[in-house]
Amino acid sequence: MLKTGSWILSIWCAINGLLALIILGYVIVLRQDSPILQVAGFSPAEIAALSARTLGALNAFTLLYNSCSLAVSILTWPLIRRELVAGDQRAFWILVVVIGWIEVMAFWASAYVGHGRWQGNVLQSALYLAGIGLCASALFSPNGRRQARTTG
């Protein structure tokens, strides 16, 4: 169960990192405005009516958030693939706090834009809960600990 849970968490990392990288490329390389405007349902006319400072602030926050999101994905990947899969309970609790916080904040932030990307939030949260749940079962249940020692 520990290996399966860690693979599911690795999928969470890959999706999270890939989305962040795509958005960073969209804003930096393609020089487009933050995709949050489309997610929030702004029409092209509404976007055109926004001031340059407002668009600049949205783009800055988009770059900052997605840079951090990409960094979290890169930093949690080895934590999952090495420490967690080896049965390290500290790695488990770090991932509970870090990824759990991100998932809660994703839903909270989504509320500000009418839950425009709720499907992505649900998918990411389902992956997180399934992965962390399987890992918890393997690390903290008596049968799981025994299995982790013999197969880990």
Q: Which role does the model predict for each range below?
A:
Residues 1-9, 51-61, 88-92, 113, ...:
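Membrane-interface helix-boundary signature
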Residues 1-32:
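Cytosolic juxtamembrane helix and N-cap/initiation of the first transmembrane helix
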Residues 16-19, 99-108:
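Aromatic-anchored segments of alpha-helical transmembrane domains
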Residues 30-37, 52-71:
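A loop-to-helix transmembrane entry motif
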Residues 129-150:
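Membrane-water interface at the C-terminal end of transmembrane alpha helices
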